[in-house]
């Protein structure tokens, strides 16, 4: 997968290219990341990249000419088929379904805004899609771009150590992940659930699915509203609710 970055701070992306899962993907040649700074396309000796907005108001906007030139250079490097994305609070909110959708693209160009944003005409003429990582304000688009890259890279074949990891992540099937345990078997009196030590893979799968459904119901119930549960899932969720109510009643009785 090829990803082009338009950013005033391309050095920030060393966190992606040098470390962790994405760093290994870059080293393996599975992920190719290139970056361009609008400053390198400024025409004055101060390398100016900001401009006052028409109509007044606080803050500055990214200057049109250096930004457009950087985008055009990235498009030329990418060749045909590159999707240009602007990281913006006004964009579609990124979720696992969106990540899966973006991962089908072989080429992405991510435009990271700064200051108060970019000229609307640049969005209209250069940007294919706008994406947001949440309803809050950040100083620029670099962190959202890194979030997008990290999440999308997990879908590239060969990036993860286990091919099933991406499909078993939280949200991959619309549910939160189940609890996980490792050694020691007992930690400060808390034991690993016996089913995980049983070696019965069918029961382990059933337990994990039940816990995933239950955790989603407890923490993110709105996610269940969009799911058509299978007969097995509905049964397991009902079991979890019954067990949870019993535990709550038991806890209240001890209080």
Curated annotation (Swiss-Prot):
HAMAP family membership: TrmD
- One biological-process term from Gene Ontology? tRNA N1-guanine methylation
| Name of the protein | tRNA (guanine-N(1)-)-methyltransferase
Q: Which organism is it from?
A: Enterobacter sp. (strain 638)
Q: What does this protein do?
A: Specifically methylates guanosine-37 in various tRNAs.
Keywords, comma-separated and alphabetical: Cytoplasm, Methyltransferase, S-adenosyl-L-methionine, Transferase, tRNA processing
Source species taxonomy: Bacteria, Pseudomonadati, Pseudomonadota, Gammaproteobacteria, Enterobacterales
Q: Which reaction does it catalyse?
A: guanosine(37) in tRNA + S-adenosyl-L-methionine = N(1)-methylguanosine(37) in tRNA + S-adenosyl-L-homocysteine + H(+)
What Enzyme Commission number(s) apply to this enzyme?
Answer: 2.1.1.228
